[in-house]
Protein backbone atom coordinates (compact mmCIF):
# COMPACT_ATOMS: atom_id res chain seq x y z
CA UNK A 1 0.00 0.00 0.00
CA UNK A 2 1.25 3.49 -0.85
CA UNK A 3 2.24 5.27 2.38
CA UNK A 4 0.45 8.51 1.52
CA UNK A 5 -2.80 6.61 0.96
CA UNK A 6 -2.63 4.33 3.98
CA UNK A 7 -5.22 4.76 6.77
CA UNK A 8 -4.47 6.26 10.18
CA UNK A 9 -6.58 6.34 13.34
CA UNK A 10 -6.70 9.26 15.77
CA UNK A 11 -8.73 8.24 18.81
CA UNK A 12 -12.09 7.10 17.44
CA UNK A 13 -11.61 8.65 14.00
CA UNK A 14 -10.02 6.66 11.17
CA UNK A 15 -8.81 8.64 8.17
CA UNK A 16 -8.44 6.85 4.81
CA UNK A 17 -5.21 8.61 3.87
CA UNK A 18 -2.57 11.01 5.19
CA UNK A 19 -3.61 14.13 3.26
CA UNK A 20 -5.04 17.05 5.25
CA UNK A 21 -6.63 20.15 3.77
CA UNK A 22 -5.12 22.89 5.92
CA UNK A 23 -7.31 25.48 7.62
CA UNK A 24 -7.29 28.56 5.39
CA UNK A 25 -8.85 31.87 6.40
CA UNK A 26 -11.33 33.06 3.79
CA UNK A 27 -12.31 36.43 5.31
CA UNK A 28 -15.79 35.92 3.90
CA UNK A 29 -18.07 35.55 6.94
CA UNK A 30 -20.68 38.09 8.03
CA UNK A 31 -20.78 38.81 11.78
CA UNK A 32 -18.84 35.59 12.20
CA UNK A 33 -21.48 33.61 10.32
CA UNK A 34 -20.65 31.26 7.45
CA UNK A 35 -21.95 32.43 4.06
CA UNK A 36 -22.59 30.98 0.61
CA UNK A 37 -18.84 31.29 0.02
CA UNK A 38 -18.20 28.70 2.72
CA UNK A 39 -20.71 26.34 1.11
CA UNK A 40 -18.84 26.62 -2.20
CA UNK A 41 -15.31 26.68 -0.78
CA UNK A 42 -15.65 23.86 1.75
CA UNK A 43 -17.97 21.92 -0.52
CA UNK A 44 -15.52 21.57 -3.36
CA UNK A 45 -12.62 20.84 -1.01
CA UNK A 46 -14.73 18.13 0.63
CA UNK A 47 -14.74 16.35 -2.76
CA UNK A 48 -10.95 16.55 -3.04
CA UNK A 49 -10.20 13.01 -1.91
CA UNK A 50 -8.19 14.18 1.12
CA UNK A 51 -8.51 12.27 4.38
CA UNK A 52 -9.31 15.29 6.54
CA UNK A 53 -10.73 18.74 5.81
CA UNK A 54 -9.97 21.37 8.45
CA UNK A 55 -12.23 24.42 8.58
CA UNK A 56 -10.41 27.74 8.77
CA UNK A 57 -9.31 29.49 11.97
CA UNK A 58 -12.62 30.03 13.74
CA UNK A 59 -12.73 32.80 16.32
CA UNK A 60 -14.09 31.90 19.74
CA UNK A 61 -15.23 35.48 20.43
CA UNK A 62 -15.81 38.56 18.25
CA UNK A 63 -12.70 40.36 19.53
CA UNK A 64 -10.65 37.29 18.60
CA UNK A 65 -11.21 37.73 14.86
CA UNK A 66 -8.31 38.69 12.63
CA UNK A 67 -10.66 40.70 10.41
CA UNK A 68 -14.29 41.80 10.47
CA UNK A 69 -15.06 38.89 8.16
CA UNK A 70 -13.47 35.99 10.03
CA UNK A 71 -15.53 32.89 10.69
CA UNK A 72 -16.69 32.54 14.29
CA UNK A 73 -18.36 30.08 16.65
CA UNK A 74 -19.47 32.07 19.69
CA UNK A 75 -23.27 32.15 19.68
CA UNK A 76 -26.39 30.45 18.34
CA UNK A 77 -26.29 32.44 15.09
CA UNK A 78 -22.72 31.46 14.19
CA UNK A 79 -23.47 27.85 15.09
CA UNK A 80 -26.65 27.80 13.01
CA UNK A 81 -24.91 29.29 9.97
CA UNK A 82 -22.51 26.34 9.81
CA UNK A 83 -25.22 23.67 9.96
CA UNK A 84 -26.25 23.72 6.28
CA UNK A 85 -22.62 23.79 5.15
CA UNK A 86 -21.78 20.72 7.21
CA UNK A 87 -25.01 18.98 6.25
CA UNK A 88 -24.17 19.36 2.55
CA UNK A 89 -20.67 18.00 3.09
CA UNK A 90 -21.98 14.96 4.97
CA UNK A 91 -24.60 14.29 2.30
CA UNK A 92 -22.21 14.34 -0.63
CA UNK A 93 -18.72 13.51 0.71
CA UNK A 94 -17.36 10.87 3.11
CA UNK A 95 -14.56 13.15 4.31
CA UNK A 96 -13.94 13.79 8.00
CA UNK A 97 -14.17 17.44 9.05
CA UNK A 98 -12.07 19.20 11.69
CA UNK A 99 -12.26 22.78 12.90
CA UNK A 100 -9.44 25.05 14.00
CA UNK A 101 -10.37 27.15 17.05
CA UNK A 102 -8.49 30.41 17.37
CA UNK A 103 -8.08 33.82 18.95
CA UNK A 104 -6.09 36.45 17.07
CA UNK A 105 -4.78 38.33 20.10
CA UNK A 106 -2.76 41.39 19.05
CA UNK A 107 -3.17 40.49 15.36
CA UNK A 108 -6.91 41.20 15.57
CA UNK A 109 -8.68 44.16 13.95
CA UNK A 110 -6.83 43.79 10.64
CA UNK A 111 -7.74 44.36 7.02
CA UNK A 112 -8.18 41.35 4.76
CA UNK A 113 -4.93 40.47 2.96
CA UNK A 114 -6.24 41.75 -0.39
CA UNK A 115 -6.99 45.08 1.32
CA UNK A 116 -3.42 45.37 2.61
CA UNK A 117 -3.67 43.38 5.84
CA UNK A 118 -2.84 46.33 8.10
CA UNK A 119 -4.21 47.20 11.54
CA UNK A 120 -7.59 48.97 11.49
CA UNK A 121 -7.74 51.78 14.04
CA UNK A 122 -10.70 52.09 16.38
CA UNK A 123 -11.56 55.41 14.73
CA UNK A 124 -11.81 53.61 11.39
CA UNK A 125 -14.12 50.86 12.64
CA UNK A 126 -11.60 48.53 14.26
CA UNK A 127 -11.34 47.46 17.88
CA UNK A 128 -8.70 47.32 20.59
CA UNK A 129 -6.97 43.96 20.54
CA UNK A 130 -6.10 41.93 23.63
CA UNK A 131 -2.79 40.15 24.13
CA UNK A 132 -0.51 38.76 26.84
CA UNK A 133 1.26 42.11 27.07
CA UNK A 134 0.82 45.65 25.77
CA UNK A 135 3.38 45.03 23.02
CA UNK A 136 2.28 45.80 19.43
CA UNK A 137 2.91 43.39 16.58
CA UNK A 138 4.70 46.12 14.62
CA UNK A 139 6.50 49.23 15.79
CA UNK A 140 4.20 52.22 15.56
CA UNK A 141 0.96 50.28 15.91
CA UNK A 142 -1.48 50.93 18.75
CA UNK A 143 -0.47 48.60 21.59
CA UNK A 144 -2.98 45.88 22.51
CA UNK A 145 -4.56 45.71 25.95
CA UNK A 146 -2.79 43.31 28.31
CA UNK A 147 -5.17 40.59 29.44
CA UNK A 148 -6.08 40.61 33.13
CA UNK A 149 -7.45 37.68 35.11
CA UNK A 150 -11.02 38.37 34.01
CA UNK A 151 -9.91 38.46 30.38
CA UNK A 152 -8.05 35.18 30.66
CA UNK A 153 -11.10 33.57 32.24
CA UNK A 154 -13.35 34.95 29.51
CA UNK A 155 -11.18 33.56 26.72
CA UNK A 156 -10.81 30.21 28.47
CA UNK A 157 -14.59 29.97 28.75
CA UNK A 158 -14.98 31.02 25.10
CA UNK A 159 -12.77 28.18 23.89
CA UNK A 160 -14.77 25.70 25.98
CA UNK A 161 -18.08 27.02 24.67
CA UNK A 162 -16.86 26.88 21.06
CA UNK A 163 -15.67 23.29 21.52
CA UNK A 164 -19.11 22.31 22.81
CA UNK A 165 -20.77 24.00 19.84
CA UNK A 166 -18.37 22.20 17.48
CA UNK A 167 -19.36 18.91 19.09
CA UNK A 168 -23.05 19.67 18.58
CA UNK A 169 -22.33 20.42 14.93
CA UNK A 170 -20.79 16.96 14.57
CA UNK A 171 -17.25 18.19 13.98
CA UNK A 172 -14.95 15.15 13.98
CA UNK A 173 -11.84 16.79 15.43
CA UNK A 174 -10.59 20.12 16.78
CA UNK A 175 -7.25 21.80 16.20
CA UNK A 176 -6.28 24.47 18.73
CA UNK A 177 -4.41 27.28 16.95
CA UNK A 178 -1.21 28.09 18.86
CA UNK A 179 0.83 29.20 15.84
CA UNK A 180 1.39 32.01 13.34
CA UNK A 181 1.58 34.82 15.86
CA UNK A 182 -1.96 34.58 17.19
CA UNK A 183 -2.93 34.73 20.85
CA UNK A 184 -1.68 31.38 22.15
CA UNK A 185 1.55 31.73 20.18
CA UNK A 186 1.91 35.21 21.67
CA UNK A 187 1.83 33.68 25.14
CA UNK A 188 4.49 31.14 24.16
CA UNK A 189 6.93 33.57 22.56
CA UNK A 190 9.16 35.82 24.67
CA UNK A 191 8.98 38.30 21.79
CA UNK A 192 5.31 38.98 22.60
CA UNK A 193 4.94 37.87 26.21
CA UNK A 194 6.47 40.31 28.72
CA UNK A 195 4.26 39.36 31.66
CA UNK A 196 5.68 39.14 35.17
CA UNK A 197 2.95 36.95 36.68
CA UNK A 198 2.50 33.17 36.50
CA UNK A 199 1.81 33.45 32.74
CA UNK A 200 5.10 35.09 31.78
CA UNK A 201 8.84 34.89 32.26
CA UNK A 202 10.02 31.28 32.25
CA UNK A 203 9.14 28.85 29.48
CA UNK A 204 7.01 26.91 31.95
CA UNK A 205 5.02 30.04 32.76
CA UNK A 206 4.66 31.08 29.11
CA UNK A 207 3.27 27.64 28.27
CA UNK A 208 0.74 27.78 31.10
CA UNK A 209 -2.17 29.57 29.39
CA UNK A 210 -1.93 27.66 26.08
CA UNK A 211 -1.88 24.41 28.07
CA UNK A 212 -4.90 25.55 30.07
CA UNK A 213 -6.73 26.28 26.81
CA UNK A 214 -5.89 22.82 25.49
CA UNK A 215 -7.14 21.20 28.71
CA UNK A 216 -10.33 23.26 28.50
CA UNK A 217 -11.02 22.24 24.91
CA UNK A 218 -10.15 18.60 25.55
CA UNK A 219 -12.56 18.47 28.50
CA UNK A 220 -15.36 20.12 26.50
CA UNK A 221 -15.08 17.91 23.40
CA UNK A 222 -16.26 14.27 23.27
CA UNK A 223 -13.65 11.83 24.52
CA UNK A 224 -13.78 9.68 21.39
CA UNK A 225 -12.98 12.59 19.06
CA UNK A 226 -9.38 13.83 18.70
CA UNK A 227 -7.97 17.23 19.62
CA UNK A 228 -4.66 18.46 18.22
CA UNK A 229 -2.63 21.65 18.28
CA UNK A 230 -0.94 23.71 15.56
CA UNK A 231 2.35 25.23 16.67
CA UNK A 232 5.04 27.43 15.20
CA UNK A 233 8.21 25.44 15.78
CA UNK A 234 10.37 28.56 15.61
CA UNK A 235 9.82 32.32 15.42
CA UNK A 236 12.72 32.68 12.96
CA UNK A 237 13.91 35.58 15.13
CA UNK A 238 16.85 35.55 17.54
CA UNK A 239 15.66 35.41 21.13
CA UNK A 240 12.27 34.01 20.18
CA UNK A 241 10.52 30.67 20.53
CA UNK A 242 12.67 27.83 19.19
CA UNK A 243 12.43 24.13 18.30
CA UNK A 244 13.60 22.98 21.74
CA UNK A 245 10.74 25.00 23.24
CA UNK A 246 8.29 23.37 20.84
CA UNK A 247 9.49 19.92 21.86
CA UNK A 248 9.03 20.79 25.54
CA UNK A 249 5.54 22.12 24.77
CA UNK A 250 4.69 18.97 22.80
CA UNK A 251 5.72 16.78 25.75
CA UNK A 252 3.32 18.70 27.99
CA UNK A 253 0.53 18.46 25.42
CA UNK A 254 1.05 14.72 25.07
CA UNK A 255 0.74 14.31 28.83
CA UNK A 256 -2.62 16.09 28.62
CA UNK A 257 -4.00 13.86 25.88
CA UNK A 258 -3.13 15.77 22.71
CA UNK A 259 -3.65 13.61 19.62
CA UNK A 260 -1.41 15.37 17.09
CA UNK A 261 0.94 18.30 16.58
CA UNK A 262 0.61 20.30 13.36
CA UNK A 263 4.09 21.77 12.94
CA UNK A 264 4.37 25.11 11.15
CA UNK A 265 6.56 28.13 11.95
CA UNK A 266 6.78 31.91 12.19
CA UNK A 267 4.15 34.62 12.33
CA UNK A 268 4.81 36.32 15.65
CA UNK A 269 7.23 38.99 14.39
CA UNK A 270 7.60 41.00 11.17
CA UNK A 271 11.37 40.65 11.69
CA UNK A 272 11.29 36.94 10.84
CA UNK A 273 13.60 35.67 8.12
CA UNK A 274 12.29 32.40 6.69
CA UNK A 275 14.48 30.33 4.30
CA UNK A 276 11.72 29.11 1.97
CA UNK A 277 12.27 25.90 0.01
CA UNK A 278 10.24 22.74 -0.70
CA UNK A 279 9.49 20.98 2.58
CA UNK A 280 11.42 23.56 4.61
CA UNK A 281 9.36 22.87 7.74
CA UNK A 282 9.45 19.06 7.54
CA UNK A 283 12.56 18.79 9.78
CA UNK A 284 10.56 20.43 12.58
CA UNK A 285 7.78 17.84 12.33
CA UNK A 286 10.40 15.10 12.14
CA UNK A 287 12.17 16.39 15.28
CA UNK A 288 8.94 16.62 17.28
CA UNK A 289 7.83 13.14 16.20
CA UNK A 290 11.15 11.56 17.13
CA UNK A 291 11.52 13.39 20.44
CA UNK A 292 7.94 13.13 21.67
CA UNK A 293 6.54 10.08 19.91
CA UNK A 294 3.20 11.53 18.94
CA UNK A 295 1.55 11.94 15.52
CA UNK A 296 2.69 14.98 13.58
CA UNK A 297 1.48 16.90 10.55
CA UNK A 298 4.09 18.35 8.20
CA UNK A 299 3.22 21.50 6.27
CA UNK A 300 4.88 24.02 3.99
CA UNK A 301 5.65 23.74 0.26
CA UNK A 302 4.96 20.01 0.07
CA UNK A 303 3.51 20.15 -3.43
CA UNK A 304 4.73 17.01 -5.21
CA UNK A 305 3.07 13.62 -4.59
CA UNK A 306 6.36 11.72 -4.61
CA UNK A 307 7.78 14.11 -2.00
CA UNK A 308 4.71 13.77 0.21
CA UNK A 309 4.73 9.98 -0.06
CA UNK A 310 8.44 9.80 0.65
CA UNK A 311 8.27 11.75 3.90
CA UNK A 312 5.32 9.65 5.16
CA UNK A 313 7.09 6.44 4.14
CA UNK A 314 10.27 7.55 5.93
CA UNK A 315 8.37 8.32 9.12
CA UNK A 316 9.26 12.01 9.05
CA UNK A 317 5.60 12.84 9.73
CA UNK A 318 2.27 11.05 9.86
CA UNK A 319 0.31 13.51 7.70
CA UNK A 320 0.95 16.22 5.16
CA UNK A 321 -1.23 19.34 5.21
CA UNK A 322 -1.75 21.37 2.08
CA UNK A 323 -3.21 24.85 1.67
CA UNK A 324 -2.34 26.97 -1.36
CA UNK A 325 -1.49 23.91 -3.45
CA UNK A 326 -4.97 22.54 -2.72
CA UNK A 327 -6.60 25.82 -3.73
CA UNK A 328 -4.69 25.79 -7.00
CA UNK A 329 -5.49 22.12 -7.62
CA UNK A 330 -8.57 21.06 -5.60
CA UNK A 331 -8.18 17.50 -6.97
CA UNK A 332 -4.57 17.19 -5.83
CA UNK A 333 -5.30 13.94 -3.94
CA UNK A 334 -6.82 12.42 -7.10
CA UNK A 335 -3.78 13.35 -9.14
CA UNK A 336 -1.44 12.10 -6.40
CA UNK A 337 -3.25 8.77 -6.24
CA UNK A 338 -3.01 8.42 -10.02
CA UNK A 339 0.71 9.19 -9.98
CA UNK A 340 1.44 6.82 -7.09
CA UNK A 341 -0.80 3.97 -8.24
CA UNK A 342 -3.20 4.31 -5.32
CA UNK A 343 -6.97 4.63 -5.02
CA UNK A 344 -9.08 7.56 -3.88
CA UNK A 345 -12.77 8.07 -3.17
CA UNK A 346 -14.77 10.12 -5.67
CA UNK A 347 -18.50 10.88 -5.82
CA UNK A 348 -20.43 8.84 -8.42
CA UNK A 349 -21.33 12.04 -10.26
CA UNK A 350 -17.62 12.33 -11.13
CA UNK A 351 -16.80 8.69 -11.91
CA UNK A 352 -16.81 9.29 -15.64
CA UNK A 353 -13.84 11.62 -15.21
CA UNK A 354 -11.56 8.69 -14.33
CA UNK A 355 -8.76 8.61 -16.95
CA UNK A 356 -8.64 5.47 -19.08
CA UNK A 357 -5.05 4.82 -18.11
CA UNK A 358 -6.00 4.82 -14.40
CA UNK A 359 -8.92 2.40 -14.46
CA UNK A 360 -8.66 1.53 -10.75
CA UNK A 361 -8.21 5.11 -9.48
CA UNK A 362 -11.73 5.37 -8.03
CA UNK A 363 -11.83 1.74 -6.92
CA UNK A 364 -14.44 -0.80 -7.97
CA UNK A 365 -16.90 1.38 -9.87
CA UNK A 366 -19.35 0.72 -12.66
CA UNK A 367 -21.84 2.80 -14.61
CA UNK A 368 -23.83 2.57 -17.80
CA UNK A 369 -26.34 4.34 -19.98
CA UNK A 370 -29.17 3.50 -22.39
Q: Where are the predicted features?
A:
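Flavin-dependent oxidoreductase catalytic cores
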Residues: 1-370
Amino acid sequence: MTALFSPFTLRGVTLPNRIVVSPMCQYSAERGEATDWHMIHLGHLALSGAGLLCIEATAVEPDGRITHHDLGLWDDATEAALKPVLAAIRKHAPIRVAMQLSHAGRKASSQAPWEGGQLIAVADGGWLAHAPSAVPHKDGETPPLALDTAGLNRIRDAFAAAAKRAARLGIDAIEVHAAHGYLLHQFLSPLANRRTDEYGGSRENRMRFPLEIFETVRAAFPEDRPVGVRVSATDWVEGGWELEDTIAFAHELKRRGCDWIDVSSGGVSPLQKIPLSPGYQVPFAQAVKRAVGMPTIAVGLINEPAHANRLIDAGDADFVAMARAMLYDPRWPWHAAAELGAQVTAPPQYWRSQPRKHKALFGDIAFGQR
